[in-house]
A protein has these predicted regions:
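Cys-dependent protein tyrosine phosphatase-like superfamily
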Residues: 1-149, 162-263
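Ser/Thr-glycine-rich phosphate-binding loops at phosphate-binding pockets of nucleotides
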Residues: 154, 158-159
């Protein structure tokens, strides 16, 4: 399981270090960190991050970045790699995207779950998204003195998928990947409560369907990661082929990632 790193104002921040691969090696601590957006951080947060990381990868859309730009962390490089474009409703936290999605799905839990599942499939079937995740992995292949941190808005879908991809490449067993993916529900309880309250306020309703829908839209569900893996198998046959044909990695790239991040 990844390790939660607690900050004043940085949600769902986790070090993948300590996760155990199928061959018994573990991911090196202090090298791979996922999080939510680096917006409105405290001075303490920034100081701590500057000692932990040397690279930030921002996976959000341009609209999200413009609405809530990352705070500058001294001593770090910044890479903007938006992994979704026009199909981002349900994944993006840009204001218009959230409002439209809530309006459509607030009383439809099954529709909400299916909507998010379809987003995870699009990560695989969109050549644009694949190329962007390939760029993410290229940065991980570079040499780094400290950790690489990648984030989206709350560290759930896009950052979560990036974590799933690198964990799978490093040989972490599927069940461990899924268990870690679902921990987001524990770490974003406050965020989810805010979204439920927002939806109830917008609809002026206390219908129990609202909470169910919001949990699917703003939490994680096993069906999402299963949809991702299913899409990989449908399009590429195996994850190995996905790594090569989808993400553009060579055999030597995969081996180098394992050498760099496992011990």
């Amino acid at each position: 399981m990844s390790t939660l790193l607690k900050f004043d104002n940085l949600s769902n921040t986790r070090d993948l270090g300590g996760m155990v691969s199928s061959d018994g090696r573990t991911i090196v601590p202090g090298k791979l960190i996922r999080s939510g957006q680096l917006y409105n951080l405290t001075e303490s947060d920034i100081k701590r991050l500057s000692g932990l990381i040397d690279t930030v990868i921002d996976l959000r859309t341009e609209d999200e970045r413009r609405e809530k730009p990352d705070d500058v962390v001294p001593g770090t490089g910044y890479h903007f790699i938006p992994v979704v474009a026009s199909f981002s409703e349900g994944v993006s936290r840009a204001v218009g995207s959230v409002e439209n999605m809530v309006a459509r799905l607030v009383f439809n839990p099954e529709g909400a779950r299916n909507h998010l599942g379809s987003m995870y499939r699009k990560f695989v079937f969109s050549d644009y998204s694949l190329s962007q995740y390939g760029r993410f992995l290229r940065i991980l292949l570079d040499d780094h003195d400290r950790a690489v941190l990648w984030h989206c808005s709350v560290g759930k879908d896009r950052a979560g998928t990036a974590a799933v991809i690198i964990e799978k490449i490093l040989g972490i067993p599927d069940q461990a990947i899924i268990d870690d993916f679902l921990k987001t529900n524990d770490y974003l309880k406050e965020d989810l409560a805010r979204m439920i309250a927002y939806a109830k306020s917008k609809t002026d309703s206390d219908d129990p369907l609202i909470e169910q829908s919001m949990r699917y839209l703003f939490g994680t569900d096993r069906s999402y990661i299963e949809a991702f893996f299913s899409a990989v198998n449908e399009r590429f046959g195996t994850f190995d082929t996905f790594e090569r044909a989808g993400l553009g990695l060579s055999d030597s790239d995969v081996e180098r990632l394992r050498e760099k991040y496992l011990r």
